Amino acid sequence: MIDDTLAVNIKHLIPSTDSVYIMNIQTYLGNYPVRYCGWFPDWNIRLFNKNVMRWNDNYVHEKLVSDVSLKCVKIQGKIDHFSFRDEAHMKIKYDYYARLRAEEWKKAQKSPPLIKKYFGPYFRFFRTYFLKLGILDGKAGFTIAKNEYHLKKDELKYFYQKK
């Protein structure tokens, strides 16, 4: 869902073939707009010329890439993105992402450093909850940090299971 500001700005936009347009995405956990945890602001390319941009081959968090230099234009307003209905839904999606990430590492023949194997999940929680201020999102911030811990732990578990 886009807000009124973004709708008006898109309506008045004169697109250019040498530009990409980024928009701010407000992610929700249930009905709660996550303001911290590194999730907001979250500027992403949402309008682009498909003749000069393409998606990379990542299984998780695909990115747009281009062989030519493009101007990045911010469009004010925001997109409301209801990623997770609740914590149970988040766990299901994160488990899926963990399996994909492990498969991606395997395909690339990349092995996580030993320190990541033992400390990665703990650091992920610490980074999300404290460094990225998830603590200020209250219960939602703790839920996200806890699930980030399990995501990293499961990525590593699935990677080493498949070896």
Regions found by a protein language model. Give the residues of each.
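Catalytic-site signature of metal-activated, phosphate-bearing donor transferases
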Residues: 3-163
